């Protein structure tokens, strides 16, 4: 079974939390029993999260050797110039090593998304922009660290697709069961 969930902002990509006070978890969304997250989205990120009850499928979805592209819409602080975008495309050096090259483009206008709660801070004197970033890795907070490394701090991060699966019309907290056969074999 493969479940597509639009993970809201402020929710952990796990079913329990022992911190005090406890944070929101996947347990509140009425997901099918026995599924678990195949990959993660950090607490401050939102969007597509895949869940499955199939171990081999989870491996194919998360192992970097299978190169499942992950696509994000990223609101950044600043006005990206050509050199910053090219650096992201070429791959940047992070503290855990260089990233693979990425597909990056500036979106001409802000994507139509649901409101975030709490809203992203607005600074009238500092411009912001939206980027579409596609990577085939999945390091901890990778996209946030990549944009920060070129001087563009991330304000909002929404994963919109993983491989052949996309959010489509799912609203935050909504989920659907989908076809797991869309996983491409490793190249």
Swiss-Prot record:
Active-site residue list: 42 (nucleophile)
EC number(s) stated in the UniProt entry for this protein: 5.4.99.20
Keywords, alphabetical: Isomerase, rRNA processing
GO function terms (MF aspect): 23S rRNA pseudouridine(2457) synthase activity; RNA binding
Biological processes, Gene Ontology terms: pseudouridine synthesis; rRNA processing
UniProt xrefs under InterPro entries: PsdUridine_s_RsuA/RluB/E/F_cat (IPR042092), PsdUridine_synth_cat_dom_sf (IPR020103), PsdUridine_synth_RsuA/RluA (IPR006145), PsdUridine_synth_RsuA/RluB/E/F (IPR000748), PsdUridine_synth_RsuA/RluB_CS (IPR018496), RsuA_PseudoU_synthase (IPR050343), TruA/RsuA/RluB/E/F_N (IPR020094)
Keyword hit for Thylakoid: no
Catalytic activity: uridine(2457) in 23S rRNA = pseudouridine(2457) in 23S rRNA
Record's keyword annotation contains Ligase: no
Pfam families: PseudoU_synth_2 (PF00849)
Function: Responsible for synthesis of pseudouridine from uracil-2457 in 23S ribosomal RNA.
Family: Belongs to the pseudouridine synthase RsuA family.
Protein name in the entry: Ribosomal large subunit pseudouridine synthase E
Organism of derivation: Xanthomonas campestris pv. campestris (strain ATCC 33913 / DSM 3586 / NCPPB 528 / LMG 568 / P 25)
Gene expressing this chain: rluE
